[in-house]
Amino acid sequence: MGVNQPLGGNVTVTSLDKLVNWVRKSSIWPMTFGLACCAIEMMATGASHNDLDRFGIIFRASPRQADCIIIAGTVTKKMLPVIQTVYEQMPEPKWVIAMGACACSGGIFDTYSVVQGIDEALPVDVYIPGCPPRPEALLYGLMKLQDKIMQESNSFGSVFGLGERVSTV
């Protein structure tokens, strides 16, 4: 009884977490939220020269179709509730990228009306510094997000509400 011939290279053994994380990292759909000059660089990143499709990254215009939001530019206190509403409309699991000096730390605008970093309101997964960061920097940040997704554990259980996702990074 049993298998008479070895299976060879036809079988891959992995954990369910790694399989689900591989699928998630291979199909990141970021929602663009361009607030200032960083949005121009974000649009340049989406051009054919960079070919984000080869990484499974496709920009979406609806928060209900996106699993990542790229906050690109200056976040004002008047715009913050809109960003939070859009973030809440995104399905789980969801990730946040802060693109540019203004989104990361408020940039040069240390005034009463500017939020000093989007991490005051949302959990940021990847920070991309620069004023504005080049398209290559955004591409590198997206690849770092893919690495972070692969390190998460209990991702499959969170799909069914069995627990929260935990990053080991």
Curated annotation (Swiss-Prot):
What is this entry's stated membrane topology? Answer: Peripheral membrane protein
Q: What is this protein called?
A: NADH-quinone oxidoreductase subunit B
Q: Which reaction does it catalyse?
A: a quinone + NADH + 5 H(+)(in) = a quinol + NAD(+) + 4 H(+)(out)
Task: List positions binding [4Fe-4S] cluster.
Answer: 37-38, 102, 131
Species assigned in the record: Trichlorobacter lovleyi (strain ATCC BAA-1151 / DSM 17278 / SZ) (Geobacter lovleyi)
The cofactor note from the UniProt entry for this protein is: Binds 1 [4Fe-4S] cluster.
The function of this protein is: NDH-1 shuttles electrons from NADH, via FMN and iron-sulfur (Fe-S) centers, to quinones in the respiratory chain. The immediate electron acceptor for the enzyme in this species is believed to be ubiquinone. Couples the redox reaction to proton translocation (for every two electrons transferred, four hydrogen ions are translocated across the cytoplasmic membrane), and thus conserves the redox energy in a proton gradient.
Q: How does it assemble?
A: NDH-1 is composed of 14 different subunits. Subunits NuoB, C, D, E, F, and G constitute the peripheral sector of the complex.
Q: Which GO terms describe its molecular function?
A: 4 iron, 4 sulfur cluster binding; iron ion binding; NADH dehydrogenase (ubiquinone) activity; NADH:ubiquinone reductase (non-electrogenic) activity; quinone binding
As cofactor, the record names:
[4Fe-4S] cluster
Question: Which terms are listed as keywords in the entry?
Answer: 4Fe-4S, Cell inner membrane, Cell membrane, Iron, Iron-sulfur, Membrane, Metal-binding, NAD, Quinone, Translocase, Transport, Ubiquinone
Subcellular location as annotated: Cell inner membrane
Q: InterPro entries, from UniProt?
A: NADH_UbQ_OxRdtase-like_20kDa, NADH_UQ_OxRdtase_20Kd_su
Out of the domains of life, which is the source? Bacteria
- Which enzyme class, named as a word? translocase
Q: Which family does it belong to?
A: Belongs to the complex I 20 kDa subunit family.
The Enzyme Commission number assigned here is: 7.1.1.-
BP term (GO), one: aerobic respiration
Q: What is its main location?
A: membrane
Question: Which GO cellular component terms are attached?
Answer: plasma membrane; respiratory chain complex I
